[in-house]
Swiss-Prot record:
Keyword Chloroplast in record: yes
Organism: Marchantia polymorpha
Origin superkingdom: Eukaryota
Subcellular location: Plastid, Chloroplast
Cited NCBIfam families: S15_bact
Protein's recorded name: Small ribosomal subunit protein uS15c
Family stated for the protein in its record: Belongs to the universal ribosomal protein uS15 family.
A Pfam family of this chain: Ribosomal_S15
Main subcellular location: plastid
A single GO cellular-component term on record: ribonucleoprotein complex
Length: 88
């Protein structure tokens, strides 16, 4: 995989695991893994549907973080190397 986004999960408390930032981090890891999977299995349409659901959930969480804590949103976007939300 091109991006390895791993974190030592034992050092993270249960409260931090429920945070929006951590949820976005976990969803981004799943997106990276599925993207790698699709390079080998391009016609796996059921997994593509799952990927779209994950992307939708991540987008909603990013929108929430954008509204509530913009500084944290910007830091997370840079740290994960993903695009931010579209600006209208």
């Amino acid at each position: 995989m091109s991006k390895n986004l791993f974190m030592d999960l034992s050092s993270i408390s249960e409260k931090e695991k429920g945070s929006v930032e951590f949820q976005i981090f976990r969803l981004t890891n799943r997106v990276v893994k599925l993207t790698y999977h699709f390079k080998k299995h391009g016609k796996d349409y059921s997994s593509q549907r799952g990927l779209w659901k994950i992307l939708g959930k991540r987008k909603r969480l990013l929108a929430y973080l954008f509204k509530t804590n913009f500084v944290s949103y910007e830091n997370l976007i840079i740290q994960l190397g993903i695009r931010g939300l579209k600006k209208n």
